[in-house]
Design a protein with these regions (language model features):
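N-terminal accessory alpha/beta regions
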Residues: 1-140
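Short Cys/His-centered divalent metal-binding micro-motifs
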Residues: 202-212
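Short Cys/His-rich Zn2+-coordinating modules
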Residues: 135-148, 184-191
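Short, cysteine/histidine-rich loop/knuckle motifs that typically chelate Zn2+
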Residues: 161-165, 208
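Histidine-centered nuclease catalytic patch
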Residues: 167-201
Length: 212
């Protein structure tokens, strides 16, 4: 991979100022139990669930820590060294890499997850770090909030940083949506969903490299 040398301090600050408030607001709502995330476990005899942050769980401690501006800045705009420190922090909160697994019905039946009551519709509340992080940073922030076209334009890359051969220009035609390069998560969002919109983890790349 080729080094991306177009990143500037001003670019990082603009990125933080644009997205930090939204992320922080979601974090606070999760901490206060105001957001529940619908889901289900199993294919037959499905269990209706709602993911919800329970106080003093690892999920709660992570959100409480990284909702603070200095830590949130590291999460969104930190160097690679700082992102690796965040991963180590998560591993210390949740040992044995359990946070990387998605919730399963079998593990639920073994009472592996924290049950936090039953909602009025009969859905059971569980606190599962990976599922909640994926909803916040991938489903909500990356898919719906992140202005991907603006992000790519500001970086100003012309050649794919992975292969160094394919062009990744943005094509704009009057009356048509702009055609933009793919954005790859260098550290995969399936394993590290909390880095879903971390600036340095977002790599504009060509179609071929994104499919590898």
């Amino acid at each position: 991979m080729y080094r991306i040398d177009t990143i500037t301090d001003n670019m990082l600050e603009d990125y933080f100022n644009k997205y930090a408030i939204k992320v922080k607001n979601y974090m606070i709502q999760l901490l206060n139990g105001k957001i529940t995330i619908p889901g289900e476990l199993g294919t037959k005899n499905k269990i209706l669930i709602k993911y919800k942050v329970k106080k003093d769980t690892p999920t709660w401690h992570f959100l409480n820590k990284y909702a603070q501006d200095a830590n949130l800045h590291k999460l969104l705009c930190g160097s690679w060294e700082e992102l690796l420190e965040i991963i180590s922090d998560v591993e210390s909160l949740i040992p044995n890499l359990e946070w990387k697994k998605r919730a399963t019905k079998a593990e639920y039946n073994k009472k592996k997850y924290q049950i936090d009551g039953i909602d009025t519709d009969g859905s059971k509340f569980i606190d599962h770090f990976n599922e909640i992080m994926h909803w916040l940073f991938v489903d909500t922030m990356y898919e719906n909030e992140l202005d991907k076209l603006q992000f790519i334009e500001k970086l100003g890359l012309k050649i794919c940083p992975y292969c160094g051969r394919q062009h990744i220009n943005i094509a704009k035609l009057s009356g048509h949506r702009a055609s933009k390069p793919n954005i790859d998560h260098f550290l995969p969002k399936s394993l590290y969903p909390f880095l879903g919109i971390s600036f340095r983890n977002l790599i504009p790349c060509c179609y071929v490299c994104n499919e590898v």
